């Protein structure tokens, strides 16, 4: 699509040092004999160059925001390669390391490195008085509640209940359903790289961003999209703490967003980066009422908060990636029990009570386990053997968190039950082996 080269000028631009991150979508008008005509929106700038020089995305291309992708590069002779005006990602109550979990979401997006800023929450009366019009600041909300993550840009046009903004993609995800809320710019910080905005974010959902395309974000007013409600309970030495937040109900996003919120809140509860043990219990509710309950454990020698947070998004990633149907996750209730002790043991020795066992009988195996900095313990497990076994049988013994490693042994693929329907996938999630369990497999 074509872009229009412009030079921004005037007292405001002089004060800000040029086009700032967060100004993307700012409407540009041309004076005509019939009055001002909307040319388009500020969309692209040249990094480490004159910040007053920018490229405008034409309004006709923004109105056709469902068209195909543009070239991967936008280059202007004499100026070099242009990049989209950086979109500030505003974080409220999110640490730098929790924000790092978000990086995969922005890795393929056609945006410049994002200035990450702490934001505040605007008062309710400001939301009530907010007017959505060209030039207004809005925030596309990814997480809201006790954790907030949103991206700030500018409205280009509001036409017949439809909104156009940004003048370039945000994540480049195509068809989306993301809520947008008011944003209130508090300051513009000059910078030699790219000036950027500081802003507070409102809570009132103004509508839904439905298209995240190369030329614009396009959305509808007064239409609130579905979100995933997350309730998080943390139980540790300081007692129980409860939190709540909502994340975008996009399968490409919610596993990472849930994990990001969990890491921030676990970090806040622990107050330190240290090793330990965590037990996670999920209740995932799908639209229609079906529930998936899971229990899992994780141990880490140096960073239990990060390990638990990454695990928190695991079942959601499985649901999001399934090939059978949309998961339609509605709610996630997550209870996390934290312990600063290392609750892990290594399997030091396994001894068969008898090396000869009749088919259909059970093999008894004595295991010596070495817990972390505690006395070794001996446990005996009983392994029932099928009646049709004959010849030499190998017993594979591992912890539930250890993947199957068979070496030169050949496993019958028919014995490895892979889900074939969405219902079977849910059953597999419910019954999957926990990290605290021992797995003994007989292989012929």
Task: Give, region by region, the residue ranges found by the protein language model.
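Terminal presequence/propeptide segments associated with secretion/organelle targeting
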Residues: 1-444
């Amino acid at each position: 699509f074509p872009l229009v080269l412009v030079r921004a000028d005037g007292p405001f631009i002089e004060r800000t040092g040029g086009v700032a991150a967060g100004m993307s979508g700012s409407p540009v008008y041309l004076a005509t004999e019939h009055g001002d005509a909307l040319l388009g929106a500020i969309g692209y700038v040249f990094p480490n160059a004159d910040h007053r020089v920018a490229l405008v995305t034409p309004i006709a291309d923004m109105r056709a925001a469902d068209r195909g992708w543009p070239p991967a590069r936008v280059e202007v002779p004499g100026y070099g390669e242009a990049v989209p005006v950086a979109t500030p990602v505003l974080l409220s109550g999110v640490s730098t390391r929790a924000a790092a979990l978000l990086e995969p979401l922005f890795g393929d997006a056609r945006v410049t490195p994002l200035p990450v800023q702490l934001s505040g929450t605007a008062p309710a009366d400001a939301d009530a008085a907010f007017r959505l019009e060209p030039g207004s600041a809005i925030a596309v909300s990814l997480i809201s509640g006790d954790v907030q993550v949103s991206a700030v840009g500018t409205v280009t046009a509001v036409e017949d209940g439809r909104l156009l903004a940004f003048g370039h993609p945000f994540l480049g995800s195509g068809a989306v359903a993301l809520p947008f809320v008011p944003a209130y710019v508090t300051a513009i910080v000059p910078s030699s790289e790219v000036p950027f905005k500081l802003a507070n974010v409102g809570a009132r959902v103004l509508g839904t961003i439905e298209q995240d395309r190369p030329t614009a974000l396009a959305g509808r007013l007064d239409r609130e999209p579905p979100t995933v409600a997350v309730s998080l309970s943390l139980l540790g030495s300081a007692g129980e703490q409860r939190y709540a937040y909502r994340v975008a109900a996009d399968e490409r996003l919610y596993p990472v967003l849930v994990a990001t919120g969990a890491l921030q809140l676990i970090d806040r509860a622990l107050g330190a980066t240290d090793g330990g043990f965590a037990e996670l219990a999920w209740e995932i509710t799908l639209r229609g009422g079906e529930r998936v309950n899971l229990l899992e454990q994780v141990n880490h020698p140096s960073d239990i908060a990060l390990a638990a947070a990454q695990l928190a998004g695991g079942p959601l990633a499985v649901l999001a990636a399934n090939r059978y149907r949309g998961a339609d996750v509605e709610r996630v209730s997550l209870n996390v029990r934290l312990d600063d002790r290392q609750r892990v043991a290594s399997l030091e020795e396994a001894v068969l009570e008898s090396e000869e066992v009749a088919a259909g009988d059970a093999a008894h195996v004595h295991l010596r386990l070495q817990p972390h900095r505690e006395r070794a313990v001996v446990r005996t497990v009983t392994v029932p053997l099928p009646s049709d076994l004959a010849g030499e049988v190998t017993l594979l013994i591992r912890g539930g968190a250890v993947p199957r490693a068979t070496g030169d042994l050949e496993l019958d693929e028919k014995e490895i039950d892979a889900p074939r329907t969405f219902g079977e996938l849910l059953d597999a999630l419910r019954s999957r082996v926990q990290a605290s369990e021992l797995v003994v497999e007989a292989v012929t």
